[in-house]
């Protein structure tokens, strides 16, 4: 925020730069971390003297509203932090508004590319973080207990709906692969799916019915395309998985799944 000073840039020439607020900036954030990611965007923007407009995911709109209430209770000036609800129509209105100077986005790669392109076409700055699923390479001398703990926590925590999820493990060597697969399958079958506030549940539901349909479709496609389905999370009530509560039938729940020999 202090800018820079370069003395002696040329004979009798000193160069300095100053930084000033842009004015109004916007954050377009995903459903999976409805408080943390908006605060990533809003905090620096407000600290640098900008007004901030938050467009949260329409899948969980209530948490951002509570953030706005907390900012107001803390004494933030009226209008400095605002929340706009909506879907693509709201996003396009923000991207095209002449008074909004910059955007921050976290979400899927396709939407990141869309927002970046549309903002650039309007001469706006944007910072777009899209698609961050991780891979784990498991070497023959790896601590498999530690590797399995990391894979189970990262792959299935939050029902896999987070950018830090490790969705692919690449074991080096057939022996490593066989040992890793056996340990993973054993651990995965013991995972309990249930209400997110249930302390006995390892993870909760997917965010929407559409998400459940999409994930089931991924499993169906894997089977159709020839991958080996070691643990089938589609089987409710079977030995493949355990639901913590039968009353959860009809919710957006799916058990943990594991594929092998994916090409």
Regions found by a protein language model. Give the residues of each.
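Rossmann-like NAD(P) dinucleotide-binding subdomain of oxidoreductase/dehydrogenase enzymes
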Residues: 3-148
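ALDH superfamily catalytic-core signature
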Residues: 96, 102, 110-263
């Amino acid at each position: 925020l202090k800018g820079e000073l370069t003395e002696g840039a040329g004979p009798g020439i000193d160069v300095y730069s100053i930084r000033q607020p842009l004015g109004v900036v916007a954050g377009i954030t995903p459903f999976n971390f409805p408080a943390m990611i908006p605060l990533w965007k809003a905090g620096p923007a407000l600290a640098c003297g900008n007004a901030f407009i938050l467009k949260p995911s329409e899948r969980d709109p209530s948490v951002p509203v509570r953030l706005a209430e907390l900012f107001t209770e803390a004494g933030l000036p009226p209008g400095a932090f605002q929340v706009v609800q909506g879907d693509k129509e709201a996003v396009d209105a923000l991207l095209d508004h002449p008074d909004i100077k910059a955007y921050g986005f976290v979400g899927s790669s396709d939407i990141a590319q869309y927002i970046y392109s549309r903002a650039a076409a309007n001469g706006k700055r944007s910072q777009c973080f899209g698609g961050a699923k991780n891979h784990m390479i498991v070497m023959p001398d790896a601590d498999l207990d530690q590797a399995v703990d990391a894979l189970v926590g990262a792959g299935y925590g939050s029902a896999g709906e987070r950018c830090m999820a490790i969705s692919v493990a690449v074991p080096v060597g057939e022996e490593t692969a066989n040992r890793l697969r056996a340990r993973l399958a054993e651990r995965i079958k013991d995972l309990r799916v249930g209400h997110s506030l249930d302390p006995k549940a390892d993870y909760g539901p997917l965010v929407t019915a559409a998400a459940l349909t999409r994930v089931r479709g991924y499993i169906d496609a894997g089977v159709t395309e020839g991958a080996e389905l070691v643990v089938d999370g589609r089987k409710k009530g079977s030995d493949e998985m355990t639901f913590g509560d039968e009353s959860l039938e009809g919710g957006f729940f799916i058990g943990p799944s594991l594929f092998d020999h994916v090409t």
